[in-house]
Amino acid sequence: MRAAIVCAFLMARTAIAAPEDSDDLDRIPRDLPHAQTIPTTSRQDRVHLKIYFENAATLAARRDVDIPFPPPLPYDFQNRTSLDSVIEWRPVRQVKLVLSDRADLVEQESLALMSKQTVRNELREAYVSWEPFARTYVDAGRINAREGTALGFNPTDFFRPGTLVGQASLDPSVLSRNRLGTVMLRAQAIWDGGSVSALYAPRLFAPSAIKSALLGIDPRFAVTNAADRGLAKITWNLGDTSAEALLYLETHRSKVGFDVTRPVGQSVIAYAEWAGGYDEALIARAIGYGRETGTLPRDAPPPIPTQRARSFHNDLAVGGSWTIAAAVTFNLEYHLHQGGLSRNDWERWSGARRDIPALANELWYIRGYASDQLEPATRQQLFLRAAAPKAFVDRLELDGFSFVSLADGSTLTQITASYYLSDAWTAAFSASANLGSSRSERGSFPQVISGIVQLVRYQ
């Protein structure tokens, strides 16, 4: 129960992913699948290996909150040392084997040095890709199937739930790269001006309780493959316009999706992403999942009133990017998550009785569930971002972003400065804060501010 609720703060613990993962601007417009892959024939090019060592030290400050947060509280100190590796091997020209993995050694307050949580492993991807015909691919294994054109929220990214890798950055585009893949079988074909693909992800385990304390080398297939799911999509380019249509299939949660990207002039790119389907509201889904996994009592009622019946819900992200003289890029997006908490829901959440521990547990569980699903807890928000890859000097990169709730104006903000010491070394500092009144979405979090110092060594 406690671990499940602490997941609400996974999005508020800052640890920067590798700098090569943080450059998300190339996602607009999005490249076609495998379009960047060039079959190699020389023996020395059959193996591609990317390895880096990372040390990230985090300090955080907490505040008193109106709704009691069940223990354990978010940590104030953590040091994480990681070995991150991505290996691609082509035994023959038509076959590629891919392994993406991260091993962590964690030192953290209130955590015994040799406990089960000290050593962790995140198996992000492990799959084989076969090219039986030119530009036709069949992939099998654990694959990170990412979808969407927006940066702050991707309604068509249907395989994001339960994939969060511990201690990841707050940056949503980094989260989408640095996450667990799903075991699946995927086929896709590419042609000039478009592509088509279909995939099937089988149910391997029953749904499991949400965990914030990741143990040992658990691959966590129970969170990525807890339901039978399928996805079919087609992409096409018409002049400067890129579009994609998707059909997602899952029992009681099937959806259709569409996204489009188009440049406007020389420096602006506009994009929109939508998904819709019949589903329960976030509160009902969270309480139902807690009951199903045994985290909440079977007869636990929703802590605040909510619609129990399934209805058609829309998810939308619409916005654009503006690049100034190839030096600074600004992004502005509007997000609609129709199943999320409305202004009235947040008022009921913050006004709920505080003297009933079981009720407080359920209130925080709803937010922990939203974080685990990598979906907004609130119904409407704005996303703003600015990135300068060469700020003041060539080796300094600055970027920052904010999520602003349209229900109460509270804000989640992160600012990052990365300095490339050499081709092999990078140093970075990142700070994040939850800003708002004590009864607001962000201001109600116990963790008010956190910072991280990171040093990365590339091999």
Would you name each region that the model predicts?
Residues 49-53, 99, 140, 187, ...:
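Membrane-embedded beta-strand positions of outer-membrane beta-barrel proteins
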Residues 93-97, 135-138, 193-198, 205, ...:
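Repeated loop/turn-to-beta-strand initiation elements of outer-membrane beta-barrel proteins
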Residues 382-386, 431, 445-459:
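Outer-membrane beta-barrel "beta-signal"
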Residues 75-81, 119-124, 179-183, 190, ...:
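Residues that define the transmembrane beta-barrel architecture of outer-membrane proteins
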Residues 55-63, 91, 101-107, 142-146, ...:
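Transmembrane beta-strands of outer-membrane beta-barrel pores
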Residues 92-94, 240, 250, 261-403:
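Detector for outer-membrane/organellar transmembrane beta-barrel domains
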Residues 86-205, 236-237, 436:
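Outer membrane beta-barrel
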Residues 15-75, 84-86, 90:
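N-terminal periplasmic/intermembrane-space "pro-region" immediately following the signal or transit peptide
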